[in-house]
Amino acid sequence: HPREQVQLLAKKQVLQEALQALQVALCSQAKLQAQRELLQAKLEQLGPGEPPPVLLLQDDRHSTSSSEQEREGGRTPTLEILKSHISGIFRPKFSLPPPLQLVPEVQKPLHEQLWYHGALPRAEVAELLTHSGDFLVRESQGKQEYVLSVLWDGQPRHFIIQSADNLYRPEGDGFASIPLLVDHLLRSQQPLTKKSGIVLNRAVPKDKWVLNHEDLVLGEQIGRGNFGEVFSGRLRADNTLVAVKSCRETLPPDIKAKFLQEAKILKQYSHPNIVRLIGVCTQKQPIYIVMELVQGGDFLTFLRTEGARLRMKTLLQMVGDAAAGMEYLESKCCIHRDLAARNCLVTEKNVLKISDFGMSREEADGVYAASGGLRLVPVKWTAPEALNYGRYSSESDVWSFGILLWETFSLGASPYPNLSNQQTREFVEKGGRLPCPELCPDAVFRLMEQCWAYEPGQRPSFSAFYQELQSIRKRHR
């Protein structure tokens, strides 16, 4: 069971962290015991008699100039001398090593260079290069080659970095590493090629969201998506639990670019009912999208396994969470295009978060025109205008929200269970709609019917839905 699997994994990781903390404590205890034994041995060397009248010092670094002590025969050593004598017991036998020397930037490996963007899709390069001479280095899609991309005369230009005999060059002299090559081109202002006359001016640093693969510790597989497997994991730096979406290396470049679309959308968002992006790993293959680990699993499975035990108020709170998240996306002109219970996640405290932004798009006018057929379109959740004309908008997301409401109050049932996708389209075009679930409040079913208005303009906004659901929930106290 995915929900139980994720919870079990979290408990395993907490146990591992506790065991590590115990090991550290045991090491500290052993160290203190060794110090105690050493101190005891020193005391035994002094014997049972009275302390000596003076401490024999090996040098004159400590002040003994107190005239009063001299007059008393030096029988009362100063506190500083006693401290020095005791601390000598624990003085390290070896001097500290010299401070580490900083590695010059040009000598750092390629993946540590700020201007190296890894498996960045070619289509995204133009968005990063803004001024003539701006450049970055990336991995060629589908090939084991490196590309130097630079903006010149208003157009991004792409140069394969030739590699032969362990030397790198666009043309002419070779260098032992790509960082050395880039450093030379920047310092000398030598053109990349004689024919192009292009010179490098400013390195474009990688996105702050970029993580190294080494920053992650992968755990067990917890799911599978359209692009590859989904794993649990943690950040090596602070043990933050994460979900890691992977992209199969065998997929063509255009599909890999679509995989990263989800991260591109989520970079801009911060909302308690939207799953949080932590970073992307694009420095090498396979590409990863790293997100917060929502430990309750997906909403559809949650409804089917836990729904019968939930109070109506809890169900209303959860669909209210969905409306709040979608209201936020609506304000950002973001069209989700795949809103469904399977694409929402549930925290351990039953907070719902909108997830799976792989089909999402941001459009300034709030309308997205899709092409390419219906192969990946979730027909039973999709509005008629999107199916018929490829026209997606927040209004088409509202239609899908109505199906999500129906899934919620039918406790995870499948919509149009006895109809194929084509039969569903014909049924809806003729005015057919899903019936009211047995446990659904009448006020909520009226909201569903508003979601399923055939004309997009007749459907309410998510803001209106959120307010109405809050009002309904208050009446169910």
UniProtKB/Swiss-Prot annotation:
Spans annotated as Disordered: 49-76
Database matches in CDD domains: SH2_Fps_family (cd10361)
InterPro entries: Fes/Fps/Fer_SH2, Kinase-like_dom_sf, Non-receptor_tyrosine_kinases, Prot_kinase_dom, Protein_kinase_ATP_BS, Ser-Thr/Tyr_kinase_cat_dom, SH2, SH2_dom_sf
Protein name: Tyrosine-protein kinase transforming protein Fes
Reactions it catalyzes: L-tyrosyl-[protein] + ATP = O-phospho-L-tyrosyl-[protein] + ADP + H(+)
Residue(s) carrying Phosphotyrosine: 368
Misc. comment: This protein is synthesized as a Gag-Fes polyprotein.
Domain Protein kinase: 216-477
Transmembrane segments: none
Lineage, highest ranks first: Viruses, Riboviria, Pararnavirae, Artverviricota, Revtraviricetes
Location of the SH2 domain: 115-204
Superkingdom per UniProt: Viruses
Keyword entries, A-Z: ATP-binding, Kinase, Nucleotide-binding, Oncogene, Phosphoprotein, SH2 domain, Transferase, Tyrosine-protein kinase
Binding positions (ATP): 222-230, 245
